Amino acid sequence: MASCVGSRTLSKDDVNYKMHFRMINEQQVEDITIDFFYRPHTITLLSFTIVSLMYFAFTRDDSVPEDNIWRGILSVIFFFLIISVLAFPNGPFTRPHPALWRMVFGLSVLYFLFLVFLLFLNFEQVKSLMYWLDPNLRYATREADVMEYAVNCHVITWERIISHFDIFAFGHFWGWAMKALLIRSYGLCWTISITWELTELFFMHLLPNFAECWWDQVILDILLCNGGGIWLGMVVCRFLEMRTYHWASFKDIHTTTGKIKRAVLQFTPASWTYVRWFDPKSSFQRVAGVYLFMIIWQLTELNTFFLKHIFVFQASHPLSWGRILFIGGITAPTVRQYYAYLTDTQCKRVGTQCWVFGVIGFLEAIVCIKFGQDLFSKTQILYVVLWLLCVAFTTFLCLYGMIWYAEHYGHREKTYSECEDGTYSPEISWHHRKGTKGSEDSPPKHAGNNESHSSRRRNRHSKSKVTNGVGKK
């Protein structure tokens, strides 16, 4: 009787909720090409762990204390990643292998715990830790102390413009190409690019290196570096959207060239979701969610500059570019999970990677404020308030423009987005109308040209058991 009372049959809504959350948090691999790489190897990993620990415990020289600490930390990270492969969720991606994304999530958890640890240290202890990692940091200087910014802006020559195309300019270009691959929206990418330049203006009183000449901000940053990177990323997006992602298994490929091509394609997405951040029928909650996305994105970018300014290390130091690469790695599944949460009405919670990313962003900001109190004591509250209002106005203005363009000029094709009940399609809207063939309510003639394309998309998605735009592959 007690067991009957304690048990509860899951409703249809509960089943759908669990299914939708699992698809963004624990994506399954169904199109397995080589069985060996997807079989459980828990006993093998257990044996490897025990043997390797015994080897390092009894064979290595432990006479150097600093070497012991360093190797111990590396071993903890290594074996924590092994546990990540065994226990952590896959996330929304399965290519090139789910184990890779489990380790990415494991690294984000480690970084989160490291930031929590930093909160309980004082500034001298943090600097001692940095000097232990790299003794050369004792002699590091701030870029703002040795360089001048926004000087002689009225002098515009080709030599001066070309001199600004350094390694950082190429970093801007490729960085925005990757951001476009993640966001997949011209409007949102351009909004983030413009609002970041506004962010630099409002925080220029705290970080002098944010001061730039107008032609540097508008022409070099926004139009050339950022704009070129956005264009390249969106071109790659269109290329991936046109591709068919149901490749044959290695067993079905009989030529060496075909097998090599299939191996290379393993490092491309298993499925490509047509991203639609803004629907013409978007609710206020959707707009507010995009605004929150903008704020967190700007905060993460600001943390990059505040960290290297407060703890004094150059932009070329591994602590700087290593963090940027790491944040870029965990941003990919984060954006995917946040997009699913924002657009799928049946997804009631964010994914675990998205949750950890949000905590990391705010923890980095807290660390900067705690150890940079001398810097933040100069903060002009009015500038911060104006920045928030300006970002909100720019975001809402851009959203309105994108929605207006989508309603009047946007080319809408049938897609399988995150939210099935919010998917817009001219064919679906026509079928809901009342009318007969040949009447005014009949579909336009050009709709038939896309019929084969839409049917191919339906067949392709049905084979991979796609639900809400996430292919189980």
Swiss-Prot record:
The chain crosses the membrane at residues 36-56, 73-93, 103-123, 187-207, 217-237, 287-307, 320-342, 356-376, 384-404. This is Phosphatidylserine synthase 1. Its EC number is 2.7.8.29. GO terms for cellular component: endoplasmic reticulum membrane; membrane. It is a multi-pass membrane protein. Residues 2-35, 94-102, 208-216, 308-319, 377-383 are cytoplasmic. It catalyses: a 1,2-diacyl-sn-glycero-3-phosphoethanolamine + L-serine = a 1,2-diacyl-sn-glycero-3-phospho-L-serine + ethanolamine; a 1,2-diacyl-sn-glycero-3-phosphocholine + L-serine = a 1,2-diacyl-sn-glycero-3-phospho-L-serine + choline. It is linked to Lenz-Majewski hyperostotic dwarfism: A syndrome of intellectual disability and multiple congenital anomalies that features generalized craniotubular hyperostosis. LMHD is characterized by the combination of sclerosing bone dysplasia, intellectual disability and distinct craniofacial, dental, cutaneous and distal limb anomalies. The progressive generalized hyperostosis associated with this syndrome affects the cranium, the vertebrae and the diaphyses of tubular bones, leading to severe growth restriction. The lineage of its organism: Eukaryota, Metazoa, Chordata, Craniata, Vertebrata. Keywords: Acetylation, Disease variant, Dwarfism, Endoplasmic reticulum, Intellectual disability, Lipid biosynthesis, Lipid metabolism, Membrane, Phospholipid biosynthesis, Phospholipid metabolism, Phosphoprotein, Transferase, Transmembrane, Transmembrane helix. One of its GO terms (molecular function) is L-serine-phosphatidylethanolamine phosphatidyltransferase activity. Residues 430-473 are annotated as: Disordered. Catalyzes a base-exchange reaction in which the polar head group of phosphatidylethanolamine (PE) or phosphatidylcholine (PC) is replaced by L-serine. Catalyzes mainly the conversion of phosphatidylcholine. Also converts, in vitro and to a lesser extent, phosphatidylethanolamine. Residues 455-464 have a biased composition (Basic residues). Requires calcium ions. Inhibited by exogenous phosphatidylserine. InterPro entries: PSS. The modification Phosphoserine is found at S417, S425, S442, S454. One of its GO terms (biological process) is phosphatidylserine biosynthetic process. It comes from Homo sapiens (Human). Changing L265P: In LMHD; does not affect protein levels; increases the rate of phosphatidylserine synthesis; profoundly impairs negative feedback enzyme regulation by phosphatidylserine. Optimum pH for both PC and PE is between 7.0 and 7.5. The modification N-acetylalanine is found at A2. Residues 57-72, 124-186, 238-286, 343-355, 405-473 are lumenal. Pathway: Phospholipid metabolism; phosphatidylserine biosynthesis. Belongs to the phosphatidyl serine synthase family.
